[in-house]
Amino acid sequence: MKFIDEATIKVYAGDGGNGVATFRREKYEAMGGPNGGDGGRGGSIYMIADRNINTLVDYRYTRVFRAQRGENGRGSDQYGASGEDMVLRVPVGTVVSDKATGQVLTDLAEHGQKVMVAKGGKGGLGNIHFKSSVNRAPRQCTKGDPGEEFELYLELKVLADVGLLGMPNAGKSTFIRSVSAAKPKVADYPFTTLHPNLGVVRVDANRSFVIADVPGLIEGAAEGAGLGHQFLRHLSRTRLLLHLVDLAPFDESVDPVREALAITEELRKYDEALYNKPRWLVLNKVDMLEDSEQKVAEFVQRLGWQGRYFAISALAGIGCRELTYAIMEHVEEASRVEHEAAENTGAASMSGD
């Protein structure tokens, strides 16, 4: 299925029903006291995160959503029925923003998380509310309030443990194919990956992590060139970034060190927090090099890289097993630290109460 990661929709909550002005009519009393009921509340619109949905494709085809209007009030003190609420299901990881202001309204990061995005209007008042000692037969009633309406921007951030960075054709899709059951399109030309690919990497029966391959970056991606900038957002939730570098480019005039520096600079310009995430260097296609160990050492020295690095061949499977086990250990440790921090925060807030 094509991965749709953004959509713009309009939501219209239901208007409140109108109140009415009616009077009791009895056999010996042509016009008794007021008995006009209130209008019903308009239906509200909610969004709920659903792990069974993995794209925003439905919101590309249906863009306008209207909740039900509240019923008008009736005589005999009868209130109008409330409009039915509308629930829109979206993938876990969907960020909802007000299109007009850009303000983030909610981040639906957990399955079952539910939030109101447009509130239904209040019902109008019937004339029963306007009876007083000086006005025993009020003809006043009020209309229902309009429901809220918004144009919303939906943005899906892939929920992955590991994100892959790299120039087009660095071998990211091949790497995902090599270590997971995902089958992204692979070919020897840039921009093969046009949408984010997710792969589940299972190191044994009970341990796995999710890896995201996003479209290749080129210089200028942070300003919008190429395909990269609109997908960099998918890396924001990852626990680890892998920077894949093609050590054996088909075009011999290409300098892998220069390309690696360009990617690093794009990342820094796009988002400082993303730049500061844990990042490992993965040097790909070592099977195509003579004296690969020396070439790897020279590359690391020229780049001035101080962090962790791995030399692999995604196509031949060289070094992939060691890399995936190292990733698994990192993801598990990061998860443990996050849980401990969350527990400590919760305990601190409870003691503060």
From Swiss-Prot:
Mg(2+) binds at S173, T193. SUPFAM superfamilies: Obg GTP-binding protein N-terminal domain (SSF82051), P-loop containing nucleoside triphosphate hydrolases (SSF52540). Residues 1-159 form the Obg domain. GO terms for cellular component: cytoplasm. It comes from the Bacteria. GO terms for biological process: ribosome biogenesis. It is found in: Cytoplasm. GTP binds at residues 166-173, 191-195, 213-216, 284-287, 313-315. Residues 160-332 form the OBG-type G domain. Its cofactor is Mg(2+). Keywords: Cytoplasm, GTP-binding, Hydrolase, Magnesium, Metal-binding, Nucleotide-binding. Pfam families: GTP1_OBG, MMR_HSR1. Its EC number is 3.6.5.-. Its main location: cytoplasm. Transmembrane segments: none annotated. Monomer. An essential GTPase which binds GTP, GDP and possibly (p)ppGpp with moderate affinity, with high nucleotide exchange rates and a fairly low GTP hydrolysis rate. Plays a role in control of the cell cycle, stress response, ribosome biogenesis and in those bacteria that undergo differentiation, in morphogenesis control. This is GTPase Obg. It comes from Methylobacillus flagellatus (strain ATCC 51484 / DSM 6875 / VKM B-1610 / KT).
